[in-house]
């Protein structure tokens, strides 16, 4: 087991690469066995992971299972079912002047991959990339977030006991440890976190020309037009916004509501919050907490930037912030410029879709965009305006749990994608082998007949 000094950490990728090259690229069966072992590890320690997630984020048990554990198990099953098809060699031939060019294409692992997880979903965001990396045949080092220490230490103990370090290793530590790791000569770095830290990781990796996949965040807009209001829509938005106490990178960040349904929407939001979490959400067993003191301070500062329509209470002693709805926010306020990443929902009225989209109030390259509407023209306008890699109509967040949908950002929300086949492709590169087949050409009845010599 390596120490966390700079020299030991920097030697990790070389040791994993040497083992990979000496053993050769793992067979599909070997990869499936590793993934099966990972699945067994998750299932056998489900209760321990649930306790750790509650200790780190106050996560309710069902929320831990549905948003962290179940999605990992589903991903492993999907990958194991389809990996043979994704890994299949393709062939093609092209006629050139005097010869046939034969091309064989096949995916190959990068080698040793570094995965830096985030604290908001510390189990899922540490292991989901690892599933794709293992499926592609790589060796992995996982650095979980130090801001979710219970989950990080549990991951370290369980994985390092179950896997040899040359295959899969968890390294815990602070930001300095992460800096030492990103300076090491890995073949690929996968990072999930803030844009500021993501830039630092990319800059460090660029010094060694190490490719990087960045999964960042952004201000995901959610629009309710004049046709989109319903109690079901409101409940969907409230669930998605306050899941994990708002600490979800694809949560609806700011809600834009057509003026004709604005008051009705506000009333229904309050009713839905009360239905989900009761009149005293601090006492609810279905509501989590903010992860760190610094993030708690940032989120409560947002509350004072508008009129509180619902909620607004907080308690620093256990980092509780009530589900909060804000109205009448001054244009240019920080809450309208920065990613909120907490249980505070600004609700902004608008009167015209085209005017809203051209106003600059909606971040075009957010991680995702949501619209609730029955108006096909409005839906199409929104789709054309957004640069994000996913647009969800009449639902929120569900796409992130599907292995059939690539998950990733555009522009300031990151680059690269994973989940399902996209993960297999992200952690592998295509090797093309070409062969020239010499031919003789005879012209018969105006046709060219190729005869291989």
Curated annotation (Swiss-Prot):
Tell me the pathway. Carotenoid biosynthesis
Q: Provide ranges: composition bias, Basic and acidic residues.
A: 1-20
Question: Keywords assigned by UniProt?
Answer: Carotenoid biosynthesis, Oxidoreductase
The enzyme's first-digit EC class, named in words, is oxidoreductase
**Biological process according to GO:** aldehyde metabolic process; carotenoid biosynthetic process
The keyword Signal is assigned to this record: no
Segment forming the signal sequence: none
Database matches in Pfam families: Aldedh
- Catalysis: reaction(s): all-trans-4,4'-diapolycopene-4,4'-dial + 2 A + 2 H2O = all-trans-4,4'-diapolycopene-4,4'-dioate + 2 AH2 + 2 H(+)
Which EC number(s) does UniProt give? 1.2.99.10
Q: Where is this region: Disordered?
A: 1-23
Protein's UniProt keywords contain Oxidoreductase: yes
The record, for InterPro entries, names: Ald_DH/histidinol_DH, Ald_DH_C, Ald_DH_CS_CYS, Ald_DH_CS_GLU, Ald_DH_N, Aldehyde_DH_dom, Aldehyde_DH_NAD(P)
Q: Which GO terms describe its cellular component?
A: cytoplasm
Q: Name one GO molecular function term.
A: aldehyde dehydrogenase (NAD+) activity
- Write out the catalytic residues in the record: 215, 249
Q: Which domain of life is it from?
A: Bacteria
Give the family this protein belongs to, as stated in its UniProt record: Belongs to the aldehyde dehydrogenase family.
Q: What does this protein do?
A: Involved in the biosynthesis of the major C30 carotenoid 4,4'-diapolycopene-4,4'-dioic acid, which protects B.firmus from peroxidative reactions. Catalyzes the oxidation of 4,4'-diapolycopene-4,4'-dial to yield 4,4'-diapolycopene-4,4'-dioic aci.
Q: What is this protein called?
A: 4,4'-diapolycopene-4,4'-dial dehydrogenase
User: What is the protein's species of origin?
Assistant: Cytobacillus firmus (Bacillus firmus)
Protein's gene: crtNc
